[in-house]
Design a protein with these regions (language model features):
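Extreme N-terminal starter segment of soluble prokaryotic enzymes
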Residues: 1-4
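A short beta-strand-loop structural module common to alpha/beta enzyme folds
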Residues: 25-38
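Short, glycine-/small-residue-rich phosphate/pyrophosphate-handling segment
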Residues: 6-21, 28, 92-133
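Short, glycine-/small-residue-enriched flexible loop/hinge segments at domain edges that mediate gating
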Residues: 41-62
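Short beta-strand segments
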Residues: 6-7, 56, 85
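Mid-chain, well-packed structural core segment of small domains
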Residues: 60-97
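Hydrophobic beta-strand scaffold residues
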Residues: 27-29, 53, 83
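A short, acidic, amphipathic alpha-helical segment used as a generic capping/interface helix at domain edges
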Residues: 35-46, 68-75
Length: 133
């Protein structure tokens, strides 16, 4: 059983501190340089078999949203796992941009930074995994 963190960030951005395991489940992280790569990660077998996905779409320019929004929406709608969206306080969330039918189990917004939202996101997933057994 796996928790997959999909993170859209520049290669120079520091990686969040993630545990190797959470409630006995492996934690894997995929770093993506664009929304196109985020979409590709969501379509990979690794994401399709994950128990939970923590999705950090980061900041993308309007051109990326125009080019990838529809495909990203389709990938999220097909995602079998529940997911948590880590949202930047200064950016609209996925639901506002994509009008999702399969919305996140939770949206975490920390006013300090997206990085600061990781501990709460992991705690939510950890609790849900512990409840699921």
């Amino acid at each position: 059983m796996t928790l997959l963190v999909i993170r859209h960030a520049s290669p120079s951005a520091p990686r969040p501190q993630l545990p190797a395991q959470l409630s006995g489940h492996r934690v894997l992280c995929s770093d993506c340089a664009s929304l196109s790569e985020v979409r590709q990660c969501l379509c990979q077998p690794q994401a399709r078999s994950a128990d939970w996905v923590l999705l950090d779409v980061g900041v993308a320019d309007e051109a990326q949203w125009q080019a990838e929004g529809g495909a990203l929406q389709a990938a999220l709608e097909r995602l079998p796992a529940q997911y948590i969206e880590l949202q930047s306080p200064s950016e609209p969330g996925l639901d506002a941009r994509l009008r999702l039918q399969h919305g996140p189990a939770a949206v975490v917004v920390d006013q300090r930074s997206r990085q600061a939202g990781y501990p709460l996101s992991l705690a939510i997933v950890g609790r849900r995994l512990a409840q699921e057994g």
